[in-house]
Amino acid sequence: KEPKTIIIDYGGPNVAKPLHVGHLRSAIIGESIKRIGRFVGHKVIGDVHLGDWGLQMGLIITELKDRKPELPYFDESFTGEYPEEAPFTISELEEIYPCASGKSKEDEAYRNEALEATHLLQQGKPGYMALWNHIMNVSVTDLKRNYDKLNVSFDLWKKESDAQPYIPGMVE
């Protein structure tokens, strides 16, 4: 038979959140299928498919704004270059998200602020996009380190946000 090109979407972690046992299962099964497919002669492409474009981003942005309102990302009149270094570590991110998620379940105003931050991010607000880039860089670096420990690798690091340019045309 002629070799096929097969794309496997496995992994599926959300950025800024730690991996859990469900991600481990998906990673091991997906990596095994990828290797078997390659062993029998197919071109198999592994895609991690990151969750990076939903409410968790708005929650993180909102919590950062509450904790560090002095950051330039939240200054509407800021016109300079945003800092190259992230204003948080992976450990801080892993603490910020559950804190923000808990607040959003108890405080409707906070949840609405996070929903608005998500919307503004998806509309391309510069300060929020800069924060999103920091979140992505810090998270993906940590994810790659963790997947390397599992001997799991991906050919593609596609993410939810990659679909953003196609959404307006699909909605119309």
Question: Over which residues does each language-model region extend?
Answer:
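NTP-dependent nucleotidyl-transfer catalytic core
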Residues: 1-172
